Amino acid sequence: VQGAGWLTTEELVWNGKGQLMTQGPATYKIPAISDTPPHFKVNLVANRPNGEQTVYHSKAVGEPPFMLAISVWSALRDAVASVGDYQVNPALHTPATPERILAAVDQVKQQVR
């Protein structure tokens, strides 16, 4: 969910003086628990103990789950492409905000006319 926020809502906005205006959660929308799918199940690999002294003997996960969020962006981009019956390869920049998605849809509509 953190990665989905990174690719859809966490937009960097700079003012005319070059100052970052979206410096933290108070200035942009971050994902909330309500953004989690209602059926979100995780299965861990069975019989793979970790001998390291970590919390609950967990294994490090690092960035891979974060990067799996590209599937959210890909699904949005495919949805935009469907507007033109997949005849156009739409440009959808990240973060894929609602405004950028709408602009991409408009661009696809213009190109398939």
Give the location of each predicted region.
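C-terminal catalytic domains of large/alpha subunits in multi-subunit enzymes
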Residues: 1-113
